[in-house]
A protein has these predicted regions:
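Phosphate-/polyanion-interacting regions in eukaryotic proteins
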Residues: 1-40
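N-terminal small/glycine-rich loop or linker at the start of catalytic domains
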Residues: 41-71, 117-126, 175-178, 182-191
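Active-site mouth loops of central-metabolism enzymes
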Residues: 59-77, 127-139, 187-201, 252
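A cross-domain feature marking catalytic cores of carbohydrate-active enzymes
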Residues: 65-67, 95, 131-135, 157-159, ...
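Conserved, mostly hydrophobic/aromatic
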Residues: 83, 147
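Glycine-rich, proline-tolerant flexible connector loops at the mouths of alpha/beta enzymes
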Residues: 88-109, 220-227
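Catalytic cores of extracellular degradative/oxidative enzymes
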Residues: 101-104, 113-117, 128, 135-140, ...
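Catalytic alpha/beta core domains of metabolic enzymes, predominantly
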Residues: 142-144, 150-252
Length: 252
């Protein structure tokens, strides 16, 4: 009853001052239904994302712009078109590509939506563009609303730099009726130490799902930032297992 349905105070209660008290790790927490019912969670979940893409029985393929830093909107639009023709289902911004002067959010969105429409006319395949709107909470919310009204079909947030509360604000807004993707930048600060921090299954699994992330990117045992296989499996279980009324979150 002391935590009134918000993640910032939940984290403060579970791992606040005690995080500075020595070798202590938060491994897991069982949240009661009375607490979880305060959250709407993911709007779409795995099944909802599959419906948007009209993909029923195959893996969903996600790719990102490379190179991205310094690339103007028209260049990114061209890359988007080529990636869409190549079979990518979700094309995401790099976590470093937020709102630079050379490629602002509005212009980037316009070019990539045109590319998505062109690719759809040629292939009949839908592609989601997870545009990075990371900013201060107020500015990020304004960007989310503006992007949605401009036709955006997916949003990406560097959740561990803006906070779970800011993500939850987006997820719970009825006007922002498009999927939200969490990027893991800075998440390693929480889970990599064997002696301190918060387990990867909580920080990359249970908490972003509670906050309303429809999709989350996280390391795999085979990528450039390898994650122990058992941890990767545990994260996936947290994202997909029954969690009261909450929809699942797509692991990525």
């Amino acid at each position: 009853e002391n935590i009134n349905g918000q993640i910032p105070e939940l984290l403060t209660t579970l791992y606040g001052n005690i995080s500075m008290a020595g070798k202590i790790r938060l491994l897991d927490v069982i949240l009661p239904k009375s607490f979880v019912r305060n959250f709407k969670g993911p709007k779409f979940g795995i099944e909802g994302v599959r419906r948007l893409l009209d993909i029923k029985d195959r893996p969903i393929i996600c790719g990102m712009f490379k190179p991205c830093i310094g690339a103007p909107p028209k260049t990114l639009g061209k890359l988007f078109y080529e990636m869409a023709l190549g079979g990518i289902d979700i094309i995401k911004d790099d976590e470093l590509l937020a709102d630079p002067k050379v490629s602002p959010v509005d212009a980037r969105l316009e070019e990539c939506l045109k590319a998505a429409d062109k690719a759809f006319r040629e292939t009949g395949r839908k592609v989601l563009y997870a545009i990075n709107i990371t900013d201060s909470p107020k500015a990020m919310y304004e960007k989310a609303i503006k992007a949605k009204r401009a036709g955006a079909n997916c949003l990406m947030v560097n959740t561990y730099t803006v906070g779970f509360g800011a993500l939850a604000d987006l997820a719970e807004d009825p006007e922002i009726d498009i999927p939200l993707m969490t990027h893991p930048a800075m998440a390693g600060n929480f889970f990599l130490s064997p002696d301190y921090g918060i387990s990867s299954s909580l920080i990359l699994g249970k908490f972003p799902r509670l906050a309303g992330s429809d999709m989350i990117i996280y390391p795999s045992p085979y990528g450039k930032v390898p994650l122990v296989k058992e941890r990767a499996v545990r994260i996936s279980q947290e994202l997909r297992s029954p969690f009261y009324q909450l929809k699942s979150t797509l692991p990525g």
